[in-house]
């Protein structure tokens, strides 16, 4: 409903709640949506600051926990996850999302619990991507994909695993699941769903890495039809495009695609894609020979601190700038440890020598096109 109507309903509920714990918890949860933007919705100008939003969400969690109802607590933890996201606290958001899945692990699937179970897995996967825990993102995404209650909505079921697999370089798995995604979406009437546009863009990236420009264009069209507007895709769109462009040695176009300063991307980029965007921006600056590459590396390092994957991307870029082959190979090991087959293979290819041969073979085994050099391109 419109904000004014929602506020009126919330105020009426507050008057009726009295001392009932469940009613008080429900009203506190409503505060998170009516006055704040804790649920990552469409409010352009929420009435609360980031700190106030977090305080509202923490109060909602406290009141929900008192009820002993795991579904009420799950909904409040969702609000707290969103509050952490807007605060730029990606690791706290991921920890809260994981806690939510743990809370729901013993809850039976029912009409009452279905939404919370699905949304908890979605948020756990999304926030895991944000902090570079791709194995975690794959685990939550696989659970989502295999949920019986999503058997007939494959576009939702596969959406998070598609993103995790694409980033890790699991091209074969991503392409297989993309068929289920597309079939289910078409069967649904090609409904607009902006949150699913990221998955379509991720599939487009995989096709781009495979050198299939036609398939990439088709999936980018699907992403646009799903709702990947300029604002919505400000983080993932340039990031995915840059991955493809750099793979094919087009560093200058990649740098141009990443021209926006990270702190100017807007809210839709801030909660999952900020680390990835900043890291790719730094690498593109190095490979394109940008005069401020050291400055962009330093800025990116501050943003990605603690993220094992995007931190390794920044390390790789710094190694390339300093022509430090030993450090470059160390980043390859970091990618391997994180389960990131494509970044690992790409790094070996960039290292040259015998490792380049190993990297090229690994890229071929993943079904991806050969890399171009692209330094200064």
Write out the residue ranges for each language-model feature.
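Residues within HEAT/ARM-like alpha-solenoid scaffolds
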Residues: 23, 112-119, 194
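Hydrophobic, helix-rich cores of sensory/ligand-binding and other regulatory modules
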Residues: 73, 110-113, 154
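Conserved short loop/turn motifs at secondary-structure junctions
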Residues: 81-83, 126
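Inter-helical turn/loop segments and adjacent helix faces that build the functional surface
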Residues: 107-111, 188
């Amino acid at each position: 409903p419109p904000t004014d109507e929602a506020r009126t309903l919330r105020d009426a509920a507050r008057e009726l709640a009295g001392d009932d714990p469940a009613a008080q918890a429900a009203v506190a949860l409503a505060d998170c949506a009516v006055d704040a933007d804790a649920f990552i919705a469409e409010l352009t100008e929420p009435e609360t600051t980031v700190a106030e939003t977090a305080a509202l969400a923490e109060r909602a969690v406290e009141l929900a926990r008192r009820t002993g109802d795991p579904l009420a607590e799950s909904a409040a933890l969702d609000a707290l996850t969103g509050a952490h996201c807007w605060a730029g606290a990606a690791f706290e958001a991921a920890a809260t999302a994981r806690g939510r899945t743990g809370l729901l692990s013993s809850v039976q699937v029912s009409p009452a619990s279905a939404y919370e179970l699905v949304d908890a897995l979605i948020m756990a996967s999304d926030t895991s991507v944000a902090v570079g825990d791709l194995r975690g993102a794959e685990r939550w995404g696989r659970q989502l994909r295999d949920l019986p209650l999503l058997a007939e909505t494959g576009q939702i079921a596969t959406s998070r695993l598609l993103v995790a697999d694409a980033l890790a370089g699991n091209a074969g798995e991503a392409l297989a699941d993309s068929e289920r995604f597309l079939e289910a979406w078409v069967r649904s009437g090609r409904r607009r769903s902006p949150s699913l546009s990221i998955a379509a863009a991720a599939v487009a990236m995989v096709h781009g890495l495979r050198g299939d420009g036609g398939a990439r264009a088709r999936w980018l069209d699907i992403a646009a039809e799903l709702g990947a507007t300029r604002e919505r895709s400000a983080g993932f769109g340039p990031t995915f495009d840059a991955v493809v462009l750099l793979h094919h040695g087009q560093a200058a176009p990649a740098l141009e695609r990443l021209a926006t300063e990270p702190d100017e991307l807007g809210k839709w980029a801030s909660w999952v894609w900020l680390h990835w965007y900043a890291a790719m921006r730094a690498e593109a600056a190095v490979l394109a020979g940008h005069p401020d590459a050291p400055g962009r590396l330093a800025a990116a390092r501050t943003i990605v601190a603690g993220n094992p994957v995007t931190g390794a991307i920044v390390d790789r870029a710094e190694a390339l700038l300093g022509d430090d082959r030993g450090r470059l190979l160390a980043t390859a090991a970091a990618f391997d440890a994180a389960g990131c087959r494509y970044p690992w293979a790409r790094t070996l290819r960039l290292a040259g020598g015998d490792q380049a041969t190993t990297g090229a073979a690994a890229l071929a085994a993943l079904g991806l096109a050969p890399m171009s050099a692209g330094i200064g391109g």
